[in-house]
């Protein structure tokens, strides 16, 4: 079954190539003797079956450059590693080139299909589709982001400035009580030079008085000294008076202690009458009564 299928595929590919040759000779005047092309030289019979799956993508070739493009196609087949997407791209480019004309055939045929970056570098129009719209969106996003950042920075700058102004105002404006104190201090400082100036004037005027004192002034000074001595002697107590006061205070303390002792003992006696101690006075009275009872009475 596999051998029959491969042989049938091989015959089909040969028929396709013969039809392409006939179309070339009929349309452009191409003669096979000038540019011979043998499919056996390029593709072996075993590999023809793999090419059949993608052979229907190939457009009808027109012009003398068709054989060269087919040769390049089969040479690139091994490099594409049986990738159907790459093969479809190649067939689409060939069909587009046939529709447009053969002027750009060589440029498209020389493209490297494996390197997608080279394709995009040579034809940037396919890569730059819809880029203005994307760029506009990106620019808008960047503008909004920058606006937000500027707003945040402006707020952050405004807040510290306001706080700094408030701090400066608070530092510059002292509380009312400190302001009053500073005002009084300022007034006192202003009064100090005046007071010093008056003292200096008095000192300067003092030598103008006569150096000798009057007799009346001397008498007044001596009287004042005597009165001060009397008051000091009256205020300072004498030693006799001090000893008398000490004795009276000691006697007062003794009387207070005696009174407290009697009060305590009397209270204890009232609370415990059976255990109350007998005083010496009571003992003496009892003895006297006992002596009287023991006397010998005369007989009648």
Swiss-Prot record:
Residues 224-236 have a biased composition (Polar residues). It comes from the Eukaryota. Pfam families: DUF4640. Coiled coil: none annotated. Residues 167-186, 224-244 are annotated as: Disordered. PANTHER family: CHROMOSOME 12 OPEN READING FRAME 71 (PTHR36462:SF1). This is Uncharacterized protein C12orf71 homolog.
